[in-house]
């Protein structure tokens, strides 16, 4: 019975991990020498909406002041800590954040429990990194227009997300096989005399 519960929980986890992942869409790719790294103090403008209704729940743009925090240090939701790494000053991204990378099953202010969040983000600055005089947007090699460049950058981000999801799924399958082996080796006999 315990084994069945364990496998059921493992399978539920596997389905949840594969079904819900952080989605990163680069809407304005930028060229720079220094991208955001874990532990950087950053200044970020954003607009947050609920995926289901499109209702805005917060926006730094409305206040006229970007949010300042250390990226990758647990000061913000996990979706931001992971989704805002490797950004250039001036770059814009849209993050689609499932509950597991947001607020989970907790209701926070106008955000209902279990909500998928969508954030339009713009990196305004990185502590200790001079702001460039001119923001140079990135044109993907072979791209004929900015729209095509954005599309190609978004596809590259999606491919990276799929690779991560594939690795997680492989790890879950391996764990399920190991659990099945352990359960198969378990019986009600008080002693094991197989050897």
From Swiss-Prot:
Modes of activity regulation: Inhibited by both FK506 and rapamycin.
Any single GO CC term annotated in Swiss-Prot or TrEMBL for this entry: endoplasmic reticulum
Family classification: Belongs to the FKBP-type PPIase family. FKBP2 subfamily.
Taxonomic source organism: Gibberella zeae (strain ATCC MYA-4620 / CBS 123657 / FGSC 9075 / NRRL 31084 / PH-1)
Motif (Prevents secretion from ER): 192-195
Signal sequence range: 1-19
GO biological process: chaperone-mediated protein folding
Compartmental location: Endoplasmic reticulum
Highest taxon in the source lineage: Eukaryota
Gene designation: FPR2
Entries under InterPro entries matching the protein: FKBP2/11, PPIase_dom_sf, PPIase_FKBP_dom
EC number: 5.2.1.8
Designated name of the protein: FK506-binding protein 2
GO molecular function: peptidyl-prolyl cis-trans isomerase activity
Residue span(s) of domain PPIase FKBP-type: 39-127
Function per UniProt: PPIases accelerate the folding of proteins. It catalyzes the cis-trans isomerization of proline imidic peptide bonds in oligopeptides.
Catalytic activity: [protein]-peptidylproline (omega=180) = [protein]-peptidylproline (omega=0)
Keyword vocabulary terms for this entry: Endoplasmic reticulum, Isomerase, Rotamase, Signal
Pfam families membership: FKBP_C
